Amino acid sequence: MSLLPTATISTIAHHNGEVVTLAGWVVHKTEKGKLVFIRLRDGSGVIQCVVFRNNVTEATFAAAQQLTIESSCRITGAVRADARAPGGFELDVNAIEIIQIAPEYPIQPKEHGVEFLMEHRHLWIRSSKQHALLRIRAEIIAAAQEWLNDQGFVRFDTPILTPCAAEGTTNLFATPYFDLGTAYLGQTGQLYVEAGMMSFGKVYCFGPTFRAEKSKTRRHLTEFWMIEPEVAFALHEDNLALQERFVSAIVQRVLERRADDLATLERDTKPLERCVPPFPRITYDEALKLIAERHADVEGCTPLEWGEDLGAPHETLIASLFDRPVFVERFPSAIKAFYMEPDPQRPEVALCADLLAPEGYGEIIGGSQRIHDPALLERRIREYGLNVDDYQWYIDLRRYGSVPHSGFGMGIERATAWIAGTHHIRETIPFPRMLYRMYP
């Protein structure tokens, strides 16, 4: 005996006129005399199942009446095309097998507060919009990895437990590590993926990263996922060109394959359709001038002194001036990570860039050319107040066959928020971890 279905809702069009068995959960139910209308979801889609009392046994009709929201069941019936039905097909039911009758479902078709929904996140992800968001997230991840694989990149997995910081020491999660001292949850896989790059040439890592930032903004999570490519012999300009192609390919893939989910979210796709290379580029200095001239256009946006980093309002302002993602490049070295290559024409700035998404979504990618001179790297590590002994293996990469190289990291959740058009990053990951949120 098997409980597996003989068809899925997403492929129901291939079974028109056939009798199939679906397995899933009840989304909605309406009773009208001798008719019971059941909307069933199976994870791949939703279909309306029609139970007509005259065509089924009393036991089957009673089972239909007994079903509640989120009850699990197997429903057998004939597939019938109907232009009026959701998805264009209905199921004329002839048998129902109840697996479980669910008690009253906590999430009702009414307005619920954010805290309530987050407390019930394990159930909220079943709703149509959350389902669509997470489908888009999954498509972005698949598109990113498949595109990189097609370009000759090798996936290179990096450790989550690390002995030292990669992005600064102020936002580390620390944990005792047996007799070896303290371990830290990885802020990025980049340092380790550089080792892989020296072996394979073109690599990427994909996994969770952790930042102990006490921030409550709509753009921040303490645990998020990053995909981080690294390329040997790539200079700064090569890195920007790679990012353009990468982001554009992902967006086009989502537009092609997840149109229904974008429609569920009522996402205006016109801004996404404009996401084709080349992306505009401005320098940090040019960004400061724009902010000085236009800061009144965005609430909370104030002029910056040279050497100050861009905040969310500044990113929103700059991105609003362009119709597609925009690079802000050549930031002051002092406000960026220690491993970034200085501009040979102007050493006080780094060969780096942030890619800002339009419509107020802010930075989705950060990248740079990396320092490849071991003496310069060691000097920068000391300047940042870090323990050189912790980074000897990283400096070693430059001692044995060092080459110029570049890479970047794209945050999956920020990219999902932008592409899906959702306001808050907490809805772009199944179970968000934030300053005041660690349940469920």
From Swiss-Prot:
Q: Which GO terms describe its molecular function?
A: asparagine-tRNA ligase activity; ATP binding; nucleic acid binding
Principal location: cytoplasm
Q: Which CDD domains match?
A: AsxRS_core (cd00776)
One Pfam family named in its UniProt record: tRNA-synt_2
Q: What are the recorded Gene Ontology BP terms?
A: asparaginyl-tRNA aminoacylation
Q: Which family does it belong to?
A: Belongs to the class-II aminoacyl-tRNA synthetase family.
Q: Please state what the protein is called.
A: Asparagine--tRNA ligase
